[in-house]
A protein has these predicted regions:
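Conserved, mostly hydrophobic/aromatic
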Residues: 6, 51, 89, 124, ...
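H/E-rich (His + Asp/Glu) clusters that bind or coordinate divalent metals
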Residues: 179-200, 207, 211-366, 374
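Short, acidic/polar
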Residues: 42-51, 113-123, 259-262
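Hydrophobic faces of well-ordered beta-strands that scaffold small-molecule active sites
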Residues: 3-7, 59-61, 101-104, 133-135, ...
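A structural motif corresponding to the C-terminal end of an alpha-helix
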Residues: 50-57, 91-100, 164, 202-210, ...
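An N-terminally biased module of ancient metal coordination in phosphate/nucleic-acid-related enzymes
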Residues: 1-58, 338-341, 345, 350-366, ...
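Catalytic metal-binding/acid-base residues of hydrolase active sites
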Residues: 8, 138, 173-174, 218, ...
């Protein structure tokens, strides 16, 4: 099974963006009206089409990261926007339970305690079945006014993460600082800064089961692994494998073969999760390869640096280990199809709770190819 842990709803219907425009302008936006057909239309020619073409079985789907915009408006504006967009993500996952697993955004706001996020986090996980969320280490939008991630300022949300057993992807939003292009600089800055902050603190002594995913291949971290090992050593911190790597993971949103190969050479396989962020920051076709930059599955399929068994860990097992609610979510959706009637065409024919192994149900075509495909070997 191919599980993409990093997807955003970048193609949401125009009505959502108009609602947001009115909200930011201080107007009462009224009730958001988006039909199921509009949602289907926004996905069928984009994310769903690419899933089919690239062989991805399921995508973890969250609000568009650049549109979280925690620096816009006050805490009330952020709360209303988060709830609205999270509800849309829930509708997507309900319409396409086989394709999308819901991941949320939080109503963060500069200078406001993350404790204000707990109600929305609980609602998303307990009521809507979300399996994780995005945590913005810089709600100021490129000015970095929040305390570092190891600071007790963040502890209320960490305590709830541990209680609910959900991880966070540490993901900044758009930048209002003209010095930092938001996807080319601010995103990579955010990934790198988050990792360095975690080196500086002792967060995981207080929260040994807390889990973070650092996206975009970890920013500059793998390329400068020796620097960070050396800094940790100079700071009298434990080796990184003991200090962070039981709790910190990296995704594969790296858009060329040498970058993926470097990630695989530096970071332990058990700390790498497959992701593409398709229809995201980089949407074009690489003229050197003739393929989309963000078709990251091709890079993993092509590499000879890891075994077929390790590829299976990256494509499936690591993701479901870091996001334990995702395995339960997928099994529940498959169970519902078995207990309410015939399974949807393309789904496996054996109820997953009666089969051996820990994997949830996945399309039968993927299972039939397991003998020859490295993704399922």
């Amino acid at each position: 099974m191919i599980v993409d842990c990093h997807g955003h709803y970048t193609t949401a219907p125009a009505a959502l963006w108009e609602w947001r425009k009115q909200q930011v302008a201080g107007q009462a936006p009224g009730e958001l009206r988006i039909s199921d057909d509009e949602i289907r239309e926004s996905l069928e020619g984009a994310q769903l089409k690419l899933q089919r073409e690239r062989g991805t079985d399921v995508t973890f789907f969250s609000p568009r990261a650049g549109s979280m915009e925690h620096h816009v408006g006050d805490a009330k504006v952020s709360a209303d926007w988060s709830r609205t967009f999270n509800d849309i993500i829930h509708r997507v996952s309900a319409l396409y339970p086989r394709n999308f697993v819901p991941v949320g955004m939080l109503p963060q706001s500069p200078g406001v305690s993350p404790a204000n996020c707990i109600a929305e986090l609980e609602r998303c996980v307990k009521e809507l079945g979300f399996v994780g969320f995005n945590l913005n280490p810089d709600p100021s939008g490129g000015h970095w006014t929040a305390p570092p991630l190891y600071d007790r300022f963040w502890y209320p949300v960490y305590e709830k993460m541990v209680e609910l057993d959900v991880p966070a992807m540490v993901h900044v939003s758009s930048s209002c600082n003209p010095a930092f292009h938001f996807t080319g600089a601010h995103y990579i800055n955010g990934d790198t800064t988050a990792f360095m902050q975690l080196i500086q603190g002792d967060l995981f002594k207080d929260f040994p089961t807390l889990r973070f995913v650092i996206p975009h291949g970890g920013g500059a971290v793998p390329y400068h692994w020796g620097r960070y090992r050396g800094l940790a050593q100079d700071m009298k911190r434990p080796p990184l494998k003991d200090h962070l790597l039981k709790n910190v993971f990296f995704d594969t949103c790296v858009y060329h073969q040498p970058g993926i190969d470097l990630l695989l050479k530096v970071i332990p396989v058990e700390n790498i999760l497959f992701a593409s962020e398709m229809v995201g920051a980089v949407r074009g076709i690489d003229p050197e390869t003739g393929h989309y930059y963000d078709d990251t599955k091709r890079y993993l399929d092509s590499t000879t640096l890891v075994s077929a068994a390790d590829k299976k860990r990256i494509f499936e097992e690591n993701v479901l280990r870091v996001y334990p609610r995702a395995a339960r979510y997928l099994n529940a959706r498959c169970r519902a199809r078995w207990t309410t009637g015939s399974p949807r065409p393309g789904w496996c024919r054996t109820p997953p709770w009666r089969s051996r192994g820990s994997s949830p149900c996945w399309p039968a075509a993927a299972r039939r190819s397991s003998a020859t495909s490295p993704r399922a070997s």
